[in-house]
Design a protein with these regions (language model features):
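A short glycine-threonine-serine/GTX helix/turn-capping micro-motif
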Residues: 170-181, 203-205, 236-247, 258-261, ...
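Glycine-rich beta-alpha junction loops
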Residues: 40, 133-135, 210-215, 254-256, ...
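Terminal low-complexity tails and localization/encapsulation signals of metabolic enzymes
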Residues: 1-9, 251-253, 335-409
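N-terminal helix-loop segment corresponding to the beta1-alpha1 unit
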Residues: 1-199, 234, 380, 386-409
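Oxidoreductase and adenylate-handling cofactor-binding alpha/beta cores
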Residues: 154, 164, 183-203, 216, ...
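Aromatic-enriched alpha-helical interface/lid elements that frame and gate functional surfaces
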Residues: 246-323, 327
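Mid-domain beta-loop-alpha active-site segment that forms a flexible
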Residues: 176-191, 210-218, 264, 268
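Short Gly/Pro-enriched turn/cap motifs at secondary-structure boundaries
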Residues: 58-59, 67, 233-242, 248-249, ...
Length: 409
């Protein structure tokens, strides 16, 4: 299968998920991604055992989806950047890399000698990519954040998703939700920068913020608010079918939900009525044209709700099979992991963990030549230190002295 990033080396000095998930995508695409972890502490995310109330490690195993997801396919080196003895190793890694990838705050980068000027002094042709919470410059450049703050809360999604009058704010639907969207964005930016370097010789600096990704995800509503000159009126998501009965969610007899998104109701209404066993509704004078259907949408939506409530999810799946209009079952995450469409194209990919056990991870959604991805596991902490240093020509007494000094592990 094609590996478009084969031959590209990425040096990643990052923690948690936002920026590391970009490294995972690049590794999926064939890049050699070297993950620099602190020689004693490692990636801080390795210390997490629970997230959103869920265990994030497999008990009695080295497999940890919270690490293997955003770090699969990489090699790990334990390197204490704050120690002078680590400088030569760092510079050799920079010198032999095409991309430098980080989410450290500017003040930390300056302290560790990994700011843009520091890195470019060693390798002028390197792509420098930095992920931030709010902005790469300005008064908030040194302000840290996570996707829950920068992407979800400040980026507009949280307010938009929360119904009017709600007692509690709607939280992100999953851990690292904004981080993973942001990671794909970073990977795309790096790919474009590498393409530009190939054509022009210019090594670009790539900056992406979680706030910017959040604003982009919410861009339609943000743009509409800017056009209106005021915040958009809030509406209850349950009222999504106020002007079109074929949009919105409807509950089935067994407590599941169907999502209908048929944006051309006049086109899809007749077949829908046939499929639900109520063909007479298509000829009903209240609903027999697109204009009438939209004018009487509340009444039609009430009828649709009663109809959908009369059968189970599985019965509706069978009834709607092959229907032209757009609809979907609302799935939980376990069902997503077993979704037949995703399984068919290999996006729920097998990976063998460090104990030899076959696991499954979600692959990134980009496929080349319609071939399923082949994933490899994430690295154990500092698993490849000796291997990487050997490639740099650091062996024997020099390697031993670095370990004694605590510069590497």
């Amino acid at each position: 299968m094609i590996k478009p990033m084969e031959g590209i080396r990425v040096l990643e000095v990052a923690q948690f998920t936002f920026v590391p998930s970009a490294g995972a995508v690049l590794a999926d695409w064939g890049a050699d991604v070297i993950k620099v972890e602190h020689a004693e502490k490692g990636d801080a995310q390795r210390g997490l055992v629970k997230a959103l109330g869920h265990d994030v490690v497999s008990k009695g195993s080295s497999f940890a989806p919270i690490m293997d997801g955003p770090n699969r396919g990489k090699r790990s080196i334990g390197l204490s950047l704050e120690k002078p003895e680590a400088t030569r190793v760092l510079h050799e890694l920079i010198r032999t890399s095409d991309v430098f990838l980080t989410n450290f705050l500017p003040r930390a980068r300056a302290k560790l000698g990994i700011d843009i000027d520091d890195v470019r002094a060693v390798n002028p042709g390197i792509i420098y990519a930095a992920g931030t919470a709010f902005a790469h410059s300005g008064p908030e450049a040194d302000k840290g954040g996570y996707d829950g703050t920068a992407f979800w809360a400040r980026g507009g999604s949280a307010d938009t998703a929360t119904p009017p009058g709600a007692e509690h704010l709607v939280q992100q639907p999953g851990g690292a939700y904004g981080d993973n969207i942001g990671g794909m964005t970073i990977a795309g930016g790096i790919a474009a920068a590498l393409f530009a370097r190939e054509r022009t010789g210019h090594a670009a600096t790539v900056d992406i913020s979680l706030l910017g990704v959040g604003a982009w995800a919410s861009q339609l509503n943000v743009n509409l608010a800017l056009m209106a000159g005021a915040p958009l009126p809030k509406f209850d998501p349950r009222d999504g079918n106020v002007s079109n009965p074929l949009t919105g969610t409807y509950r089935t007899a067994d407590g599941r939900w169907l999502s209908l998104v048929m944006l051309q109701p006049g086109r899809y209404w007749p077949e829908f009525c046939e499929r639900v066993g109520r063909p007479e509704l298509a000829a009903d004078e209240r609903f027999d044209s697109a204009g009438k259907l939209m004018a009487n949408a509340r009444e039609a939506a009430g009828i649709v709700a009663e109809i959908v409530a009369g059968r189970t999810k599985d019965e509706w799946v069978a009834a709607f099979d092959g229907m032209e209009g757009q609809w979907a079952v609302v799935q939980n995450t376990f069902e997503v992991g077993h979704d037949p469409a995703l399984r068919h194209i290999g996006q729920i990919a097998e990976v063998v963990d460090a104990d030899g056990v076959v696991r499954r991870l979600v692959a990134n959604p980009v496929q080349f030549d319609r071939e399923p991805p082949r994933l490899t596991r994430g690295p154990l902490f500092a698993e490849h230190t000796d291997e990487i240093l050997g490639e740099l020509g650091i062996t024997g007494d020099e390697l031993l002295n670095l370990k004694i000094a605590g510069a590497v592990t």
